[in-house]
């Protein structure tokens, strides 16, 4: 007698990679919206009257509810209780709502004649009403995008378990970063598309809001595929996953290795995403470039990361060395930020530093996210990702404000870049510590994901 081997939908190469493209599409458009105003910070100052500090506070608002209302923790609980289909659709809908509020805030529809405008202008007068309402929208959007990031990570872990997980996560990150490249190129162009003499921040935000709707539709299509996979696998796997208890979160905060990973994450990403918000302005200031050219120069950063991350993910799947990759990524980031801080800048040096940062931004995420399932049980993997994202959000909220203040106080970018470099040094220390812990306890961070 021959034994029948049951095939599932995710055993199909075409099906699991189609699923990846669908969930990654939502993150592609989400990342576009996150940075749609990053190349236009100087335009916000000239058309909306925002200062650098106002802009930094606005950027930080994306993370406010995630940090202080503990929304990300709740998002992880929702994910572990309700599953990836419900949580993914919810996150996409929340992003669209937040984006729509932000769009209204910066449009001419939100005028000084409105009662809401006058109310928002009645307090904290140094922060314009447009910035206040845009920040509210960005807060809501931030809840959705972080929930989406956690959900997509768990979805990939489910569809690619025992397969090309690191490669899949690397490709998802690559597609998302292509969104950053696209918006740094597209946003300055869209700002002048209707009237070159009167650039506006409204058109880029409108286009990216529409794209968020398309991303939500793509995820809804994925949910039909996931429903079929669940029906094939039966209830056993899902039931095991649903045995999550809220008390399991306490295990994360008592795990030294998990906290090292979370600390490394917040330090590293706090030197990446806040820098991304100010990079165009830095290149404009230090190289004397117009906005479009400065944004175009920096747009090569996500492209470098996009190209390399899948290859590094494949290397991690087959050869391992995850902890070593984290250390190398932190080193390269330190070199990049010190270059911008201490070396007289030319376009050649700027390209070199940006490419270096792109390589760094390939190494760390490619190794970091696939390592988490090696440290925690599947039943609270969603909560583990949420806790990491929550801790990360604390840094992502704090450092745009710190950098904006440093810019207003010093009038230059040397101090901000030294702040970013110091974060890289601390991340390097934690990377070395993590490698020691892995060697001592045998977590398998240096081992390949695909077992032969």
Task: List the predicted regions and their residue ranges.
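Extracytoplasmic gate region of multi-pass secondary transporters
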Residues: 37-41, 255-309, 369, 399
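Flexible cytoplasmic inter-helical loops of multi-pass small-molecule transporters
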Residues: 221-247, 441-450
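C-terminal ends and interior cores of transmembrane alpha-helices
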Residues: 93-126, 331-345
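Helix-loop-helix hairpin linking two adjacent transmembrane segments in secondary transporters
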Residues: 172-227
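Helix-to-loop junctions at the C-terminal end of transmembrane segments
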Residues: 70-84, 309-321
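C-terminal transmembrane helical hairpin of 12-TM major facilitator-type secondary transporters
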Residues: 322-368
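A late C-terminal transmembrane helix in Major Facilitator Superfamily
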Residues: 378-410
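Cytoplasmic helix-loop-helix junction between adjacent transmembrane helices
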Residues: 131, 137-175
């Amino acid at each position: 007698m021959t034994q029948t081997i049951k095939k599932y939908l995710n055993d199909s190469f075409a099906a699991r990679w189609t699923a990846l493209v669908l969930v990654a599409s939502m993150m592609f458009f989400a990342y576009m919206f996150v940075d749609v105003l990053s190349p236009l910070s100087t335009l916000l100052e000239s058309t909306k009257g925002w200062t650098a500090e106002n802009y930094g506070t606005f950027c930080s608002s994306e993370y406010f509810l995630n940090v202080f209302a503990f929304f990300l923790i709740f998002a992880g609980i929702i994910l572990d209780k309700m599953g990836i289909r419900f949580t993914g659709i919810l996150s996409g809908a929340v992003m669209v709502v937040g984006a729509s509020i932000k769009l209204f805030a910066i449009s001419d529809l939100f005028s000084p004649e409105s009662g809401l405008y006058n109310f928002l202008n009645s307090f904290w007068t140094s922060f314009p009403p447009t910035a206040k309402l845009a920040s509210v929208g960005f807060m809501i959007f931030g809840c959705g995008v972080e929930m989406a990031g956690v959900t997509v990570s768990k979805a990939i872990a489910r569809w690619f378990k025992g397969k090309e997980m690191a490669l899949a996560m690397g490709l998802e990150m690559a597609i998302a970063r292509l969104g950053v490249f696209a918006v740094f190129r597209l946003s300055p162009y869209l700002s002048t598309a209707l009237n070159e003499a009167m650039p506006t921040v409204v058109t880029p935000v409108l286009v990216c809001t529409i794209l968020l709707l398309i991303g939500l539709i793509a995820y809804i299509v994925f949910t039909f595929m996931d429903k079929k996979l669940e029906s094939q696998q039966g209830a056993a796997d899902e039931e095991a996953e649903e045995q999550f208890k809220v008390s399991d979160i306490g295990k994360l905060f008592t795990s030294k290795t998990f906290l090292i990973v979370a600390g490394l994450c917040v330090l590293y990403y706090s030197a990446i995403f806040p820098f991304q918000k100010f990079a165009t302005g830095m290149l404009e200031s230090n190289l004397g470039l117009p906005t479009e050219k400065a944004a175009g120069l920096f747009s090569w950063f996500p492209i470098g990361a996009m190209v390399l991350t899948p290859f590094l993910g494949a290397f991690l799947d087959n050869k391992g060395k995850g902890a070593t990759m984290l250390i190398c990524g932190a080193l390269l980031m330190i070199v990049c930020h010190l270059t911008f801080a201490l070396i007289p800048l030319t376009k050649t040096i700027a390209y070199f530093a940006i490419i270096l940062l792109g390589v760094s931004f390939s190494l760390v995420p490619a190794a970091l996210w696939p390592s988490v399932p090696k440290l925690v049980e599947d039943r609270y993997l969603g909560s583990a990702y949420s806790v990491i994202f929550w801790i990360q959000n604390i840094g992502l909220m704090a450092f745009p404000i710190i950098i904006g203040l440093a810019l207003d106080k010093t009038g230059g970018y040397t101090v901000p870049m030294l702040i970013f470099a110091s974060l890289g040094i601390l991340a390097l220390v934690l990377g070395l510590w993590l490698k020691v812990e892995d060697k001592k306890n045998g977590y398998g961070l240096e081992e390949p994901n695909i077992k032969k």
